[in-house]
From Swiss-Prot:
Subcellular location, principal: membrane
Species in which this protein is naturally found: Homo sapiens
Keywords (A to Z) from UniProt: Cell membrane, Disulfide bond, Glycoprotein, Immunity, Membrane, Receptor, Signal, Transmembrane, Transmembrane helix
Disulfide bond annotation, renumbered to this chain: C43-C110, C57-C65
Glycosylated residue positions: N90, N99
Taxonomic path: Eukaryota, Metazoa, Chordata, Craniata, Vertebrata
Subcellular location: Cell membrane
Name of the molecule in the record: CMRF35-like molecule 6
Amino acid sequence: MTARAWASWRSSALLLLLVPGYFPLSHPMTVAGPVGGSLSVQCRYEKEHRTLNKFWCRPPQILRCDKIVETKGSAGKRNGRVSIRDSPANLSFTVTLENLTEEDAGTYWCGVDTPWLRDFHDPIVEVEVSVFPAGTTTASSPQSSMGTSGPPTKLPVHTWPSVTRKDSPEPSPHPGSLFSNVRFLLLVLLELPLLLSMLGAVLWVNRPQRSSRSRQNWPKGENQ
């Protein structure tokens, strides 16, 4: 294997090792709202993430999260019925879902878009959104409460734990966590064959070199 080929193999390995991903840092929180109503979610983050973009996304795929709306600085952004606004002074950002439909129910992530060269994954918090028929009531709990159909500015704000890099001590099984496990296993399966191939290539290159050196060290009498 030439030096150029070896460099190509090494670069490929590094690219696989640096593939950015998303990893849940706490067990999911739940919030509920009525069909046709609205709800708001407030996600907190660390001081070091104050100047970074914040996003709200839905994770239907394995290696990527479809961002629904993302901040650009402190200015608010809107995408259809979903809006987001960052409050750097409070180290939090608020996501508002309006005119809820049954299709809005599911798992979402609120997270911080970190530079992938500095951080290998974006810190996120999982949020489970439930939508119930209008006119019905649900019992509120520490991890869930009802939205309202009033203006967004009067909505109760649901505050989740800070978006940090500390793992929750007691994570609970959830589809979002299963996505992360699948991503991790997929990355391992992609990297392992490459590393084994690189190791085999190194051993194969070194084998003829040792053989040629041993021939050079044979006594001259044996060649005659």
